[in-house]
């Protein structure tokens, strides 16, 4: 085992432990519960991994931790894993080809991803089945969840940027 391989293995195990801890915090009842609304912490963490490590690693993290979220979600199984995969691959490719890797861009990517996820959950979970008078639900539950999750994307961005800098080999730093 080479030193570079051990460093990468330790880096991705550290990433996995952080995202798993975010999942545990996300699914613990009453923890980070603001007026009955809990943020989705796994998605911003996976998007930050995709931004700093590329679309392949981000897509894998998004898919596998999306499966974790599917196991505790009220949506159909596979909804979160498919969306997290698409969002993370898009975030990784967007930072390679379109955007700079700045904190503001990462936060905007997280905001867009969580907003799109909430709109799709609202559509496929409620509108498609013909429930009526659900506009207040969107504004009182899903809207604040989008804002709360976006606020938590800032610490994740700083944490993963710091970790990426610590684990990056000296020969590849620019």
PLM features: residue spans?
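Terminal, non-globular segments
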Residues: 1-174
